[in-house]
Swiss-Prot record:
Signal peptide: none annotated. Belongs to the PPR family. P subfamily. It comes from the Eukaryota. PROSITE patterns: PPR. PANTHER family: MITOCHONDRIAL GROUP I INTRON SPLICING FACTOR CCM1, PENTATRICOPEPTIDE REPEAT-CONTAINING PROTEIN. This is Pentatricopeptide repeat-containing protein At1g73710. InterPro entries: Pentatricopeptide_rpt, PPR_P_subfamily, TPR-like_helical_dom_sf. Residues 61-73 have a biased composition (Low complexity). Keywords: Repeat. Residues 965-974 have a biased composition (Basic and acidic residues).
Length: 991
């Protein structure tokens, strides 16, 4: 009985999991002829190795199996017609799990060729190995290299490197020498697994046995180099082979690829560089008659079509179109047969380098030579035209596949669906899906998230759900695809739909969610600001048997830090460290930024120091947050200190950091220092950004340096990067310097640039117009803001409106009354203010719109509301409506106040009702009404309107008596100065 493999030859993955599963295998005896080295791979694998088999089988049975996705699949090798007993044996093996018993029951004496067929027809590595061991168990069996090649290939394709290594050692001790085919096959399977250096070590071993690679092996090495992006090395190897040399240049290749073969206890590179050569040296080196040795350095030329195809693809991917074309021409000249793959490769090479017409002409040449295009040919042309933006041509090639008698394959449908989905062509996508349904073709699993994303982006969430549910009826999606589907919903904030998909897996199939699905679901909750749900999901992960990874911790931590939930973030960070996961720089950066936003600079500094202690190097984002935080707080010395530390640590400062530094200097008015930093930014690639320029503009504006500010502003203009802050700062500067014409020019430019988009920007321009006395233009702008843009007004807006009311001649008592109504948030205060303002500016249509809002329901029993209605109707010339409003006011029990009397006397004057004016005048004269300049002025203006200038002059004299000339003068002057100061401060504050 064979001995089990020693523990040190089992893979690290088996060591971690061997205690979970047990598997029974048949015990087979080997003949004396088939000598097996004690360390060879036995048929009764150790529990560690058997776990792999069991795990593999379990995974295959539980995971989704991609259904056939084209109406006419390519025939498999099982469709080949074999003579004799082979077909019946294959059928028996297919229907049996007990391979050994089945083979033994047939009692057949198979020839080596028939044995080869049975080995090749097995689809799983375990079955290949069991059939092989059965053959070895017969005394008549003679080991041969072809059988070992089949077994080694099966193990390599399955990534069973430990088993392959043991099989190789067994092969050597059975005296079976590898051939060129063996080496070529090993290079191929290792290369396809991404183990480039390990693959090439087989060629080195080949050289030690004095074998020289044949053309097939050479082409395999070239393909490995090509697929790993090592185009120059591939070219050197090919040319070296032609000259009779082998040029591998192993030292320049990374020792361990990204998939980490170095992680296992006995890693592949160590095996290939030590154990492998040791085994090879134990046997006498024999030169095979079938292979040329390295001493034969006669020039060689490739002769196989497959070799030329590989080389053409190599030069195409390397961008060496001339070399690819020369090889194609050489094939034509030297008589090397050209096949469909050759043309496909040339078409792809030409098309991907922008030569679509040449690609099209190659298709015609292909047909002229009698070489039929296959589905892949049309797939290539379809993708090329789609990439070029010619969707109609791409779809034409899709339709042509069936026209010429071919069948679209998985790649075809995936490509056409992705193309249409990217361009949001919903109807066309559904037409393709309908055609696939008619031909009983299922949608490829990888296309499901793409189609769903198109639906969701177009607001067709119901259709997206229907597609997902339909696909799930007969197919279990992989975790990767499920995560992609959840992410489609997450990106649009559709957390309920994402949640349904997430929990649906557990409810429908009883499977636990993968960590990737948890990570995306946490992202979905984060996007929807449902942080409690995200935390709850995270806390329940372990109970469901899924452990968080670094991505889980980092995502959750950054989500919490992003919304300044620092306490929860700290707890996650502590748990992350306890679990052995190392937070990345982005994680620390998010937390430091959160502390800075909250003004917790000392906590930010503590975390920065902890970050350095754990060996995580701070990046420019970390330093930028700290520098900006100190700059905003006016702590210039600390900001500069961290800037110097950043330079000492060799971290390149970006524009954000330098802008923060300028901001710090601006806070304390250090112009020269700010200039130095700004000049440094000018010398950098792309120059200063708009944020840095705005910081410098602000500093110049505060210091009143017009020329330098204009220079910076003009530079922004030339680059087309002026933003709202740039324009506002320049308006503030010009207005502060009394340069109102220039301020208005900037305001006009800002308006034309389309940057008037929010309340703040409108306020800035309106304040500028108000300061320049362009009251009507200011009101037009306000109407655009209020009615057309429907922006929410803020206190800055109303400050400007009250300034306009004062400048528009509205009685000061009326302005105060409206301002009080606004401050007290009285109902309908805003339409009362706007109606009064538009009336004062002569914009009666706008005024009546606002008045309609006041009168559409019950007018509030407030003086400000009735006064606004009376004033609006009076100003627009509708005397009857104004008087009706006054009468309704009295009916409501509201006595007229000074504002009402002023508006009422104006109505009398416009209507020519002199007696009415006289009544108010009389009450004012005899003290029945409180003396008011506004009311005296209203009476005087009413007499003028009624063509009684004589009475207007009388009122003027009475005003002189009531308000002594000197007091009137000083008071008026003081009020004007106070008003001007108030207006100026209000206008300035709007900036």
């Amino acid at each position: 009985m064979l001995q089990p493999s020693p523990p040190h030859y089992s893979s690290s993955r088996d060591v971690r999991h061997h205690h979970h599963h047990h598997h029974h295998h048949h015990h087979l005896a080997l003949s004396s002829k088939a000598r097996v080295f004690p360390l060879s791979l036995p048929c009764n694998f150790s529990s560690r190795v058997s776990f792999k088999l069991q795990l593999h089988c379990a995974a295959s049975s539980s995971s989704s199996v991609s259904p056939p996705r084209c109406s006419k699949p390519n025939p498999s090798s099982r469709k080949r017609k074999y003579g004799g007993v082979i077909p019946s044996i294959l059928r028996s093996l297919d229907s049996s799990t007990d391979i050994e018993t089945t083979l033994a029951s047939l009692c057949l004496n198979l020839s080596p060729k028939e044995q080869t067929v049975l080995l090749k027809e097995q689809t799983r590595w375990e079955r290949v190995l069991r059939v092989f061991r059965f053959f070895q168990s017969h005394q008549s069996y003679v080991p041969n290299v072809i059988h070992y090649n089949i077994v080694l290939r099966a193990l390599g394709r399955a990534g069973k490197w430990d088993e392959l290594r043991l099989c190789w050692i067994e092969m050597a001790h059975n005296g079976v020498l590898p051939t060129n085919n063996t080496y070529g096959m090993l290079v191929d399977v290792y290369g396809k697994a991404g183990l480039v250096k390990e693959a090439l070590l087989w060629i080195k071993h080949m050289g030690q046995r004095m074998h020289f690679p044949d053309e097939v092996t050479m082409a395999t090495v070239v393909r490995v180099f090509k697929n790993s992006g090592e185009f120059d090395r591939a070219d050197r190897f090919f040319k070296g082979w032609c000259a009779g040399k082998v040029d591998l240049d192993l030292d320049s290749i990374d020792d361990f690829p990204k998939n980490g073969s170095a992680q296992s206890p006995v890693n592949l590179k160590q095996f290939l560089s030590m154990e492998l050569f040791k085994v090879g040296a134990r046997n006498p080196i024999e030169k095979s008659l079938h292979f040329a040795s390295g001493s034969d350095s006669s020039p060689r030329k490739p002769r196989l079509t497959s070799t030329f195809n590989t080389l053409i693809d190599l030069y195409g991917k390397a961008g060496r179109l001339n070399d690819a074309a020369n090889l194609f021409s050489e094939m034509l000249k030297s008589g090397v047969p050209i096949d469909t793959v050759t043309f496909n490769t040339m078409i792809h090479t030409c098309g991907t380098h922008g030569h679509l017409s040449e690609a099209e002409s190659l298709l015609k040449k292909m047909e002229e030579k009698g070489i039929s295009p296959d589905t892949k040919t049309y797939n290539i042309l379809l993708s090329l035209h789609a990439d070029a933006g010619d969707i109609e041509a791409a779809l034409e090639y899709y339709r042509k596949i069936r026209k010429v008698g071919l069948f679209p394959d998985t790649v075809t449908h995936r490509a056409v669906l992705h193309i249409l989905c990217q361009r949001k062509m919903v109807a066309e996508v559904e037409a393709v899906i309908a055609e696939m349904d008619r031909n009983s073709i299922r949608i490829d699993e990888h296309s499901v998230p793409v189609i769903m994303q198109m639906y969701v982006n177009e607001g067709l969430v119901v259709q997206a759900k229907a597609l997902f549910e339909r696909f799930q009826l007969d197919c279990v999606l992989s975790s990767t695809t499920l995560a992609a589907v959840i992410d489609v919903y997450a990106e649009k904030g559709l957390w309920v739909e994402a949640e349904t998909v997430f929990y649906g897996k557990r409810n429908m199939s009883g499977q636990r969610n993968d960590v990737l699905e948890y990570n995306v679901m946490i992202k979905a909750y984060g996007k929807a600001k449902l942080h409690e749900k995200a935390l709850s999901l995270f806390k329940g992960m372990k109970n469901q048997g899924t452990w968080p990874d670094e991505c889980t911790y980092n995502s959750l931590f950054q989500m919490l830090a992003g919304v300044d939930l620092v306490d929860e973030a700290q707890r996650i960070l502590a748990e992350m460290l306890d679990s052995g996961c190392k937070p990345g720089c982005k994680t620390y950066a998010a937390m430091i930024a959160s502390y800075v936003r909250l003004g917790l600079l000392s906590d930010a500094v503590d975390l920065y120091e902890a970050m350095e202690k754990t060996g995580v190097k701070p990046n420019e984002v970390v330093y930028g947050s700290l520098i900006n935080g100190f700059a905003e707080s006016g702590m210039v010395e600390e900001a500069i200190q961290y800037f110097r530390m950043m330079e000492e640590h060799g971290v390149q400062s970006n524009h954000i950091v330098l802008t923060s530094l300028i901001k710090a200097y601006s806070k304390v008015g250090c112009l020269e220092e700010a200039r130095r930093v700004y000049d440094k930014m000018k010398d950098s690639e792309g120059g200063p950004d708009v944020a840095a320029s705005n910081s410098m503009l602000s500093l110049c504006a505060d210091l009143g340096i017009v020329s330098e500010a204009e220079s910076i502003f003009n530079a922004l203009r030339e680059k087309g990067t002026c933003d709202v802050i740039s324009f506002a700062t320049m308006m503030y500067l010009y207005k502060g310097m009394g340069m109102l014409d220039e301020a208005i020019e900037v305001a006009e430019e800002m308006r034309e640039s389309g940057l008037l988009s929010d309340c703040t920007s409108f306020n800035q321009v309106m304040a500028c117009y108000a300061a320049d006395g362009q009251l009507s233009e200011c009101c037009e702008l306000f109407h655009e803001m209020l009615v057309e843009r429907k922006l929410l007004l803020d206190w800055g807006t109303f400050k400007t409106l009250f300034t306009l009311l004062k400048k528009g001649g509205v009685p000061s008592e009326a302005v105060s009354q409206l301002q009080t109504a606004y401050n007290e948030a009285k109902p309908l205060a805003t339409p009362a203010i706007t109606a009064t303002l538009f009336s004062a500016m002569g914009l009666y249509a706008y005024a009546l719109e606002s008045c309609q809002e006041l009168t559409s329901g019950e007018i509030p029993r407030e003086h400000f509301a009735y006064n606004a209605v009376i004033y609006t109707y009076s100003a627009s010339g509708d005397i009857d409506m104004a008087l009706k409003a006054y009468m309704r006011m009295q009916e409501k029990g509201l006595e007229p106040d000074i504002v009402t009397q002023a508006y009422l006397v104006g109505i009398y004057g416009k209507a020519g009702m002199v007696e009415g004016v006289k009544r108010v005048h009389s009450r004012l004269t005899f003290g029945e009404l409180e003396p008011s300049q506004s009311l005296f002025k209203a009476v005087r203006d009413a007499y003028v309107s009624a063509n009684r200038q004589d009475l207007a002059d009388v009122v003027k004299k009475e005003m002189s008596i009531a308000f002594e000339a000197e007091r009137e003068c000083s008071s008026r002057s003081g009020e004007e100065e106070e008003d001007d100061e108030e207006e100026n401060s209000e206008e300035d504050e709007a900036f």
